[in-house]
Curated annotation (Swiss-Prot):
<dbReference type="GO" id="GO:0005886">
    <property type="term" value="C:plasma membrane"/>
</dbReference>
<keyword id="KW-1133">Transmembrane helix</keyword>
<dbReference type="GO" id="GO:0007156">
    <property type="term" value="P:homophilic cell adhesion via plasma membrane adhesion molecules"/>
</dbReference>
<keyword id="KW-0325">Glycoprotein</keyword>
<dbReference type="GO" id="GO:0001818">
    <property type="term" value="P:negative regulation of cytokine production"/>
</dbReference>
<feature type="region of interest" description="Narpin; mediates binding with FGFR1 and has antidepressant-like activity">
    <location>
        <begin position="149"/>
        <end position="161"/>
    </location>
</feature>
<dbReference type="GO" id="GO:0050839">
    <property type="term" value="F:cell adhesion molecule binding"/>
</dbReference>
<feature type="domain" description="Ig-like 2">
    <location>
        <begin position="148"/>
        <end position="235"/>
    </location>
</feature>
<dbReference type="GO" id="GO:1902683">
    <property type="term" value="P:regulation of receptor localization to synapse"/>
</dbReference>
<dbReference type="GO" id="GO:0010976">
    <property type="term" value="P:positive regulation of neuron projection development"/>
</dbReference>
<feature type="glycosylation site" description="N-linked (GlcNAc...) asparagine">
    <location>
        <position position="284"/>
    </location>
</feature>
<feature type="topological domain" description="Cytoplasmic">
    <location>
        <begin position="361"/>
        <end position="398"/>
    </location>
</feature>
<feature type="domain" description="Ig-like 3">
    <location>
        <begin position="238"/>
        <end position="329"/>
    </location>
</feature>
<dbReference type="Pfam" id="PF13927">
    <property type="entry name" value="Ig_3"/>
</dbReference>
<dbReference type="InterPro" id="IPR013783">
    <property type="entry name" value="Ig-like_fold"/>
</dbReference>
<keyword id="KW-0812">Transmembrane</keyword>
<comment type="subunit">
    <text>Interacts with ATP2B1; this interaction stabilizes ATP2B1 and increases ATPase activity; this interaction controls T cell calcium homeostasis following T cell activation. Interacts with XKR8; promoting its localization at the cell membrane.</text>
</comment>
Length: 398
């Protein structure tokens, strides 16, 4: 073997060896965790979710197990629908395996160790095999504490009249943990200037309107314990605060109309079109109407506008348990030639002006024009000339 061919042969042999060590697309790969469940502390009545993400080839199977506090060796498998349907297990398999364990309406008995197990061993479910060898495990500890008792005022309904001040109240009556501070939130956002260290809380709305409605929470934070909160609902009929009064489009274009409102609970939205003065629910037989509803917002999209069908008045209606409201948007659809109308108008004016000029010039000319070949004055005849010649001859004779 020559010296020049030795490095090439060595490189090829190294490539073959390294290729045999790397797992190919169909090669087996042991299960491994990408994401493991995390330990949490919760209050009674709350809920928790644990996530488990595993890889391997073939895709590993995932199971959830549970052991009570101080009984770490007494694991029992958890199934979807267990504990009076408070347990939900959602698992999906693809290139990897992903599973979510969710338990709602927690009780003190839900405390314990939760374990995610994964395996792609062909003998993983053989009872004669040792599970600690065929399955990999990831654990999380869930601690459930007794929720503090919070007494709240009743829900409030805002009326148009009379407009009276509203006072929301919360009172923390019992807790096994030391309070650090408390505050109010509306729809999940902390209200300014409400944070204090007090178990008895009040929030006053002097002139309540529909925009003041929503979910109010009094939130309490403790030392070495999860925060606790209570909810007070402030309800009001919908008040539509924004919409398009009119929409002008050309035939074949798309039109978008929208409405947004304040008020709580979030309304049910309905779009109607007025036919002969009567609002009629929109029937999407043509497949050109698309409606998007999201809490206090709705949107109507019409594609490929038709000048004979789509123009008119469109009404959006918002209705909740307290009341309803509606507004109208006028849709105008112009012809394809609409952009040419200014040009056509100017062209028509020019044509009319030319016609007027031509008619005027024709009327200005005389009815008959004399020919250039005709003499301008009367001509002497030959008879007159002959008569003169005769007189001349007669004088010469005498």
């Amino acid at each position: 073997m020559s010296g020049s061919s030795l490095p090439s042969a060595l490189a090829l042999s190294l490539l073959l060896v390294s290729g045999s060590l790397l797992p190919g697309p169909g090669a087996a790969q042991n299960a491994g965790f990408v994401k493991s469940p995390m330990s949490e502390t919760k209050l009674t009545g709350d809920a928790f979710e644990l996530y488990c993400d595993v890889v391997g080839s073939p895709t590993p199977e995932i199971q959830w197990w549970y052991a009570e506090v101080n009984r770490a060796e007494s694991f029992r498998q958890l199934w979807d629908g267990a504990r009076k349907r408070r347990v939900t297990v959602n698992t999906a398999y693809g290139s990897n395996g992903v599973s979510v364990l969710r338990i709602t309406r927690l009780t003190l008995e839900d405390s314990g160790t939760y374990e995610c197990r994964a395996s792609n061993d062909p003998k993983r479910n053989d009872l004669r095999q040792n599970p600690s060898i065929t399955w990999i495990r990831a654990q999380a500890t869930i601690s459930v504490l007794q929720k503090p008792r919070i007494v709240t005022s009743e829900e409030v309904i805002i009326r148009d009249s009379p407009v009276l001040p509203v006072t929301l109240q919360c009172n923390l009556t019992s807790s096994s943990h030391t309070l650090t501070y408390s505050y109010w939130t509306k729809n999940g956002v902390e209200l300014s200037a409400t944070r204090k260290n007090a178990s008895n809380m009040e929030y006053r709305i002097n002139k309540p309107r529909a925009e003041d409605s929503g979910e109010y929470h009094c939130v309490y934070h403790f030392v070495s314990a999860p925060k606790a909160n209570a909810t007070i609902e402030v309800k009001a009929a919908p008040d539509i605060t924004g919409h398009k009064r009119s929409e002008n489009k050309n035939e074949g274009q798309d039109a978008t109309m929208y409405c947004k409102s304040v008020g709580y609970p979030h309304p049910d939205w309905i779009w109607r079109k007025k036919e002969n003065g009567m609002p009629m629910d929109i029937v999407n037989t043509s497949g050109r109407f698309f409606i998007i509803n999201k809490e206090n917002y709705t949107e109507l999209n019409i594609v490929n506008l038709q000048i004979t069908e789509d123009p008119g008045e469109y009404e959006c209606n918002a209705t909740n348990a307290i009341g309803s409201a509606s507004v109208v948007t006028v849709l105008r659809v112009r012809s394809h030639l609409a952009p040419l109308w200014p040009f056509l108008g100017i062209l028509a004016e020019i044509i009319i002006l030319v016609v007027i000029i031509v008619v005027y010039e024709k009327r200005k000319r005389p009815d008959e024009v004399p020919d250039d070949d005709e003499p301008a004055g009367p001509m002497k005849t030959n008879s007159t000339n002959n008569h003169k010649d005769k007189n001349l001859r007669q004088r010469n004779t005498n």
